[in-house]
Amino acid sequence: MEEELNMKALITGASSGIGRDMARILAKLNYNLILVARNEDGLTKIKNELETENNKINITIYPMDLNIKENCYKLYENEKNIDVLINNAGFGLFGEFAETDLEKEITMINTNITAVQILTKLYLKDMIKKDKGNILNVASIAGFMPGPLMATYYATKNYVIALTRAVRKELKKKKSNVKISLLCPGPVDTNFNKVANVKFKIPGLSSEKVAQYAIDKMLKNKFMILPGTLIKIGKAFSEITPDIIKEEVAYHAQKRKRG
């Protein structure tokens, strides 16, 4: 499927993993791109790659840390007119809550929650005025259950899920043509694992497959995007299982990641 020229998508966390692969997919659909990440080298590399492959599109990069909320406002002021917003930036930390670094957790909350809150609200207001646009918030299957040994990360993803569900209902009630979607992947082979200092015991999906699935479903206005059969089963498990059992399952799952 080939989209019209001059459509514009903003992707955070675009220098690697799912965000980078989403950029590749949207570039093939002739979207102009605004790519945001802390890693300037990674952004420059993907920009050069995509411009070489498609000279019809414009790509703007913003090497900035969305943990700093002023950067979120600055980004919006510089790039107001977009058609697609993908809130993908985020990271996790492993360890018992009493022992993990508080400053790193505050940074995680700012990145995983505050940046999503700010960008979703600012761009949603504009999209509602135009009565068109798509927002894709990247959460995690982790957001459907408590997460001992990654307590703060699981909590941030639960926030994103709850927020996105509520916004979707508000849009439906006002019969808006603006669509919001929620991507909840499980294990994915990305740089996330290195940052969180964990290793998945079950094979992760490739970031390319997750990105392709997510973009396809978002453009079809699918709300809950669950890539892979195991993730769909995991979501169903979370809905019928008592919290005390989910806590125990999550604890042992995290424990196995560190051996």
What are these regions (language model features)?
Residues 140:
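Residue(s) in the substrate-gating loop at a strand-loop-helix junction
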Residues 29-45:
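Conserved glycine-rich Rossmann-like NAD(P)H-binding loop of the short-chain dehydrogenase/reductase
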Residues 96-98, 104-109:
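Substrate-binding pocket helix/loop in short-chain dehydrogenase/reductase
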Residues 182, 199-235:
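C-terminal helical subdomain
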